[in-house]
Every structure is written in C-alpha cells, then in structure tokens.
C-alpha cells in the first residue's frame, strides 16, 4: 500500500519512531474523540474500583486515528502491563497460546489488524475471552485428549479498519465496541501545536491551522505533514506560518481540502475513465495500480466523508462534488444514482 508524497508509508524517514515519541500518555493529554474518551474513562474507573480486568475493547475506524495510542493509554490508566502484536503475525494457535499464558493478571493485550487473524487462531480466543481459559488438544489420533488451561484475567484490545470482516462470534465477545471518527480541524490544530512544542519547532497558530485543514481529519497525517513542512521552512530559513505552510503543502501536491495526487487520480479514473460509475472496487484498484485494501481503507473513507464518492449496491458512484472538483458538470442522471444502500 502506498501513498504519494507526504502521505507515504508511516515507517518512511523514521516517522514511526517519532510518532511514538509524540503520542499522548494519558486521557488528559489525548485530544479528540470526546465521547469515546469519556466513556472509556468511566469503564476504566469502574474496573479499577472493582479491581478487575477491563472488559474487552474493540477499536475500529479509518487508519491513523489513534487506536494504538488509546490502547496504550488504557493500559497505563489501569496500571497494568501492555503487550502488542498484530493479526498477520499470529500464524498459528500456538503463537497466541504462548502470548496468553505469559500475561500477568489484568494485563492489556493489543492485537492490531485483528480482522486478519486466521480462523484457527480466532477459535482459541473464544474461551480465552469468555472464560480466561485455553482449550488445548494434546496428542494425535485416538490418543488425543483435550486439556483446559486457566489463564490470568486480561483485557483484549482489538483494532481494525474493517470491523465488518470480523467473524460474528469474535465481534460479539467485545463488551466495549468503540468507533473512532475523523478529527475536526480545531482538534488537529491543537495536536499540531503540541507536537511542534515537543519538537522545538517555531510555529504560529495560523500555520498549525493551515496544516490541520489539509490533514484529512487524521492525526497521523497531521504529524507527518508537520515534519515535512518543517523541512521546507528550515530550508527557507523561516518559521512555520500560514504562508510558509501553504507553500510547502503546494509543493507536496496537497490541496486545500486535503486531497493528494492519489486522491485526484482516483476521482479522475472514476469520473473520466468510468463515466462517474457505478464501478467496482477491484476495477478502480487495477486502474490505480493499488491494492483493493488500499482503495477501501485509505483512499475512499475520506472521499466519502467529504461527499465526493458514494457506495451503491452496483458500485462506486461519483457525487456532483467530484465533477465540480474536476471542473466538469455532473450528468443529469448522476444524482439519482447515488441513492440506495451501501455496497458491502
């Protein structure tokens, strides 16, 4: 999965380590997601008061909204240990069993991309989540027998951008489902200002506003843009203000609405190549030379949230705003094509 320019892979140029250093440590430091944060604080306080493990938590929403950060804060606020892994890494049931048996009482186990767990591993999780127990099969053939191994109470925090891909039995075992939403520009501005202070970067409030307005409602992108704008500002020998930020973002091909070159290629393909749709995700992914997951998880959520694209039972359809963005007039029948249930 790739994005062009400043929205490229988060591991690039050491950004991942820097993002970790800038992460908030407590609920008080965590900006945004007010409803989710308020509810989680109540659940944490109640669990601490009962001296119990927090109920299992499912964090879902578009990438870059702070799911890993929230999981770490939950462990810190509970005063317990934190173990992290990801769905693709746990290939066998034995891998998960080894992790679970090494947890201390009430620890938090964070599984990123939990929708990518193999089915055999999911089945191990069911008794672990419900009964804090592992059902293991020892031996083979007629001599095989089942053994139940007790586990210490723990909290599973699962994170996913594709909650709909979770098996229903697994999804139903999460007592606390939390949907994370895109951030408001004002919230991103506060995040950018706080990060700039930690980095020792001179920045004006209007400079932070310029960056946050183009960050697609996503803190991870806002922090990445801050680093790139800082590079351009330092090369110019200037502080970050509205003018210097706008110049840098223009060079990065990120427009006033936060759309980058890949977004514009998507809209161009949908509107001009496929006449506004409807067109399937696989077809669009092939036209962009991107994986379908990248189209569905990275490109489309923001475009749909901004009103450029709609999903219909027949495929993706360009909204009138997409035509306007490309300087075209929407066909008369295009508006009616937008109505109907979302595509699965």
Swiss-Prot record:
Gene Ontology MF term list = ATP binding; ATP hydrolysis activity; four-way junction DNA binding; four-way junction helicase activity
Record-listed DNA binding positions: 292, 311, 316
Q: Which InterPro entries match?
A: AAA+_ATPase (IPR003593), AAA_lid_4 (IPR041445), DNA_helicase_Holl-junc_RuvB (IPR004605), P-loop_NTPase (IPR027417), RuvB-like_N (IPR008824), RuvB_C (IPR008823), WH-like_DNA-bd_sf (IPR036388), WH_DNA-bd_sf (IPR036390)
Task: Provide the residue positions that the database annotates as binding ATP.
Answer: 22-23, 64, 67-69, 130-132, 173, 183, 220
Q: Which GO terms of the cellular component aspect does the record hold?
A: cytoplasm; Holliday junction resolvase complex
Tell me which Pfam families the record gives.
Answer: AAA_lid_4, RuvB_C, RuvB_N
Ranges for region Large ATPase domain (RuvB-L): 1-183
Q: Which reaction does it catalyse?
A: ATP + H2O = ADP + phosphate + H(+)
Q: Report which superkingdom the organism of origin falls in.
A: Bacteria
| Key word ATP-binding present | yes
| Enzyme Commission number(s) from the entry | 3.6.4.-
| Keyword terms | ATP-binding, Cytoplasm, DNA damage, DNA recombination, DNA repair, DNA-binding, Hydrolase, Nucleotide-binding
Q: Where is the signal peptide?
A: none
Task: Report the subcellular localization.
Answer: Cytoplasm
Where are the residues of the annotated region Head domain (RuvB-H)? 256-344
**Major location (coarse):** cytoplasm
- According to the record, the residues making up region (Small ATPAse domain (RuvB-S)) are 184-253
Member of which family? Belongs to the RuvB family.
Instruction: Summarize subunit and interaction data from the UniProt record for this chain.
Output: Homohexamer. Forms an RuvA(8)-RuvB(12)-Holliday junction (HJ) complex. HJ DNA is sandwiched between 2 RuvA tetramers; dsDNA enters through RuvA and exits via RuvB. An RuvB hexamer assembles on each DNA strand where it exits the tetramer. Each RuvB hexamer is contacted by two RuvA subunits (via domain III) on 2 adjacent RuvB subunits; this complex drives branch migration. In the full resolvosome a probable DNA-RuvA(4)-RuvB(12)-RuvC(2) complex forms which resolves the HJ.
Q: Describe the function of this protein.
A: The RuvA-RuvB-RuvC complex processes Holliday junction (HJ) DNA during genetic recombination and DNA repair, while the RuvA-RuvB complex plays an important role in the rescue of blocked DNA replication forks via replication fork reversal (RFR). RuvA specifically binds to HJ cruciform DNA, conferring on it an open structure. The RuvB hexamer acts as an ATP-dependent pump, pulling dsDNA into and through the RuvAB complex. RuvB forms 2 homohexamers on either side of HJ DNA bound by 1 or 2 RuvA tetramers; 4 subunits per hexamer contact DNA at a time.
Entry note about domains: Has 3 domains, the large (RuvB-L) and small ATPase (RuvB-S) domains and the C-terminal head (RuvB-H) domain. The head domain binds DNA, while the ATPase domains jointly bind ATP, ADP or are empty depending on the state of the subunit in the translocation cycle. During a single DNA translocation step the structure of each domain remains the same, but their relative positions change.
Name this polypeptide is given: Holliday junction branch migration complex subunit RuvB
């Amino acid at each position: 999965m790739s994005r062009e320019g400043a929205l490229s892979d988060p591991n690039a140029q050491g950004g991942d380590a820097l993002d970790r250093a800038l992460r908030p440590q407590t609920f008080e430091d965590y900006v945004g997601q007010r409803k989710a944060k308020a509810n989680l604080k109540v659940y944490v306080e109640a669990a601490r008061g009962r001296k119990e493990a927090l109920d299992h938590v499912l964090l879902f929403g578009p990438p870059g909204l702070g799911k890993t950060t929230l999981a770490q804060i939950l462990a810190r606020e509970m005063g317990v240990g934190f173990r992290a892994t990801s769905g693709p890494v746990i290939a066998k049931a034995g891998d998960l069993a080894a992790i679970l048996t090494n947890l201390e009482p009430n620890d938090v186990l964070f599984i990123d991309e939990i929708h990518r767990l193999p089915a055999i591993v999911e089945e191990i999780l069911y008794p672990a989540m419900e009964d804090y127990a592992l059902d293991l099969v020892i031996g083979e053939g007629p001599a095989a027998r089942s053994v139940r191994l007790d586990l210490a109470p723990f909290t599973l925090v699962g994170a996913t951008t594709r909650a709909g891909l979770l098996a229903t039995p697994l999804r139903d075992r999460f007592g606390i489902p939390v949907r994370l939403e895109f951030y408001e520009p004002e919230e991103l501005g506060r995040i950018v200002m706080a990060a700039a202070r930690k980095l020792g970067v001179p920045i004006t409030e209007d400079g932070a506003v310029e960056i946050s307005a183009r960050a697609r409602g996503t803190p991870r992108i806002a922090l990445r843009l801050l680093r790139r704008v800082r590079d351009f500002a330092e090369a110019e020998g200037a502080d970050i203000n509205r003018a210097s930020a706008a110049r840098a973002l223009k060079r990065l091909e990120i427009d006033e609405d936060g759309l980058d070159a890949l977004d514009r290629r998507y809209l161009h393909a949908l509107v001009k190549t496929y006449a506004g749709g409807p067109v399937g995700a696989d077809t669009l992914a092939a036209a962009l030379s991107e994986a379908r997951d990248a189209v569905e998880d990275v490109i489309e959520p923001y475009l749909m949230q901004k009103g450029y694209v709609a999903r219909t039972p027949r495929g993706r359809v360009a909204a009138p705003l997409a035509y306007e963005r490309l300087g075209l007039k929407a066909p008369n029948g295009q508006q009616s094509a937008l109505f109907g249930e979302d595509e699965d």
